[in-house]
């Protein structure tokens, strides 16, 4: 079925992919992205593991109503989370060579 040495090569390739995935996951955890809301008046910096590192609020918003500020902070957090997901997807595509996984299947296995 696999031919001479085919299974060994397959296992070696699987191990190499697993090693690459571990490195990419470390890179993702260290990366930081910034999400914005209100045309940049509120910025949230988030790590690849979805930890919020920094919230930057333009001083002009501190004079406005509290509810609007809360909405902008939530929107900036959501934007940062979306950017993290996009970066994770791009990084994993580099490792998998764009291989499409079945829905619900997560890497690493």
Curated annotation (Swiss-Prot):
Compartments reported by the entry: Cytoplasm, Nucleoid
Pfam families in the cross-refs: YbaB_DNA_bd
Gene Ontology MF, one: DNA binding
Keywords: Cytoplasm, DNA-binding
Domain of life assignment: Bacteria
Disulphides: none
Main location: cytoplasm
GO cellular component: bacterial nucleoid; cytosol
InterPro entries hit by this protein: YbaB-like_sf, YbaB/EbfC
Location of region: Disordered: 88-109
Family: Belongs to the YbaB/EbfC family.
Subunit and interaction comment: Homodimer.
PANTHER family for the chain: NUCLEOID-ASSOCIATED PROTEIN YBAB
Summary of the function given for this chain in its UniProt record: Binds to DNA and alters its conformation. May be involved in regulation of gene expression, nucleoid organization and DNA protection.
Name of the featured protein: Nucleoid-associated protein swp_1717
Organism ancestry: Bacteria, Pseudomonadati, Pseudomonadota, Gammaproteobacteria, Alteromonadales
């Amino acid at each position: 079925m696999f031919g001479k040495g085919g299974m060994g090569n397959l296992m070696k390739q699987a191990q190499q992919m697993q090693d690459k995935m571990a490195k990419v996951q470390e890179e993702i955890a260290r990366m930081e992205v910034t999400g914005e809301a209100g045309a940049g008046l509120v910025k949230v910096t988030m790590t690849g593991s979805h930890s919020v590192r920094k919230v930057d609020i333009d001083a002009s918003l501190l004079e406005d109503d509290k509810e609007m500020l809360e909405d902008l902070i939530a929107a900036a957090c959501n934007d940062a989370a979306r950017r993290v997901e996009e970066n994770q997807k791009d990084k994993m595509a580099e490792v998998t060579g764009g291989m499409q996984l079945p829905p619900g299947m997560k890497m690493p296995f």
